[in-house]
Amino acid sequence: MAHGPGALMLKCVVVGDGAVGKTCLLMSYANDAFPEEYVPTVFDHYAVSVTVGGKQYLLGLYDTAGQEDYDRLRPLSYPMTDVFLICFSVVNPASFQNVKEEWVPELKEYAPNVPFLLIGTQIDLRDDPKTLARLNDMKEKPVCVEQGQKLAKEIGACCYVECSALTQKGLKTVFDEAIIAILTPKKHTVKKRIGSRCINCCLIT
């Protein structure tokens, strides 16, 4: 964390498989508008002024590319990070699996002491008929809240938050929780947030 002339500067880096909604997550939050087209990200940066607990912060949001082609380039954005958001799409079970197989190991290698949150994206598609039909054809189904909560506990995430960049449901909570994770390090509980509900679950250590 670096101190500016006014607000406290915080750095938040978003990681996860390609096309799970990382860029949409950031753009919808930073610009209050959902992007119309998908453009694979190499690296991008946004800055948003936010107030949490009556205090103002300048949150630097760093987007990263999830594709394997950028495996060597991506960690260049990791130094001085205050918190990571590991994203997966709730309608892409493979991206959920890769959280544990790829993204957690990568963060443990390059930023072992930095807190991270587990973020389930694209929840607006959970009940979408076309999406459900596509998943059914592959003998798959959307990732449920309980699965996300369980994985968050397994990997040691600060909390599990679900959101939709399209409808903005849960979107503000994602970044409020990210700031809280920075300001209260070494949390020993995982929280599940759905709307206004919050359930605490103790981690087994």
UniProtKB/Swiss-Prot annotation:
One of its GO terms (biological process) is regulation of cell shape. A lipid is attached at C202 (S-farnesyl cysteine). CDD domains: Tc10. Regulated by guanine nucleotide exchange factors (GEFs) which promote the exchange of bound GDP for free GTP, GTPase activating proteins (GAPs) which increase the GTP hydrolysis activity, and GDP dissociation inhibitors which inhibit the dissociation of the nucleotide from the GTPase. Keywords: Cell membrane, Cytoplasm, GTP-binding, Lipoprotein, Membrane, Methylation, Nucleotide-binding, Prenylation. Gene3D superfamilies: P-loop containing nucleotide triphosphate hydrolases. It is found in: Cytoplasm; Cell membrane. Signal peptide: none annotated. Its main location: cytoplasm. May be post-translationally modified by both palmitoylation and polyisoprenylation. InterPro entries: P-loop_NTPase (IPR027417), Small_GTP-bd (IPR005225), Small_GTPase (IPR001806), Small_GTPase_Rho (IPR003578). It is a lipid-anchor. Residues 203-205 form a propeptide. GTP binds at residues 16-23, 63-67, 121-124. GO terms for cellular component: actin filament; cytoplasm; membrane raft; plasma membrane. GO terms for molecular function: GBD domain binding; GTP binding; GTPase activity; profilin binding; protein kinase binding. Plasma membrane-associated small GTPase which cycles between an active GTP-bound and an inactive GDP-bound state. In active state binds to a variety of effector proteins to regulate cellular responses. Involved in epithelial cell polarization processes. May play a role in CFTR trafficking to the plasma membrane. Causes the formation of thin, actin-rich surface projections called filopodia. NCBIfam families: small_GTP (TIGR00231). Belongs to the small GTPase superfamily. Rho family. This is Rho-related GTP-binding protein RhoQ. It comes from Rattus norvegicus. The gene is Rhoq.
